[in-house]
Amino acid sequence: MAEKMNVESFNLDHTKVKAPFVRLAGTKVGVHGDEIYKYDVRFKQPNKEHMEMPALHSLEHLMAELARNHTDKLVDISPMGCQTGFYVSFINHSDYDDALEIIATTLTDVLAATEVPACNEVQCGWAASHSLEGAKALAAEFLDKRDEWKNVFGE
């Protein structure tokens, strides 16, 4: 890689990581002292595999809605454009292990879901692009490898 770039993930050597993993990608402190903790929640191996858009889209809806049942510290869950994972951000919540637990509990909730929240043209910008079963399969696969989540580089 060349010079350091402004975007943290552009400075990550994607050939060195081993998905699945959850890593602290960065922190920001606001002018009033609030701290944002942004996690890279990587479901798929970069440049080798990716999530199909309907499944990813549904998983985003499900996680965004269901995670808020477990914490009031969630700021956002954002899908990565490369379709390999999500960014999950918390405010004033520095506990990595608890963040993992919130993610695990949320994905367990996904497995029990009977519908995708806000899967309609009024509440979603591409309501036709969803797959509940695909989202459940992604959640199950990620949960099955929970013992790997802390091992970003497969060491």
Swiss-Prot record:
Keywords: Autoinducer synthesis, Iron, Lyase, Metal-binding, Quorum sensing
Origin superkingdom: Bacteria
SUPFAM superfamilies listed in its UniProt record: LuxS/MPP-like metallohydrolase
EC code: 4.4.1.21
Pfam families the UniProt entry points to: LuxS
Molecular-function GO terms, alphabetical: iron ion binding; S-ribosylhomocysteine lyase activity
Keyword Protease: no
Cofactor dependence: Fe cation
GO aspect biological process, one term: quorum sensing
Catalytic activity of the protein: S-(5-deoxy-D-ribos-5-yl)-L-homocysteine = (S)-4,5-dihydroxypentane-2,3-dione + L-homocysteine
Gene3D superfamilies recorded: S-ribosylhomocysteinase (LuxS)
Cofactor binding mode and count: Binds 1 Fe cation per subunit.
Binding site residues for Fe cation: H57, H61, C124
Known function: Involved in the synthesis of autoinducer 2 (AI-2) which is secreted by bacteria and is used to communicate both the cell density and the metabolic potential of the environment. The regulation of gene expression in response to changes in cell density is called quorum sensing. Catalyzes the transformation of S-ribosylhomocysteine (RHC) to homocysteine (HC) and 4,5-dihydroxy-2,3-pentadione (DPD).
Subunit and partners: Homodimer.
PANTHER family xrefs: S-RIBOSYLHOMOCYSTEINE LYASE
Family of the protein in this entry: Belongs to the LuxS family.
Protein name: S-ribosylhomocysteine lyase
Originating gene: luxS
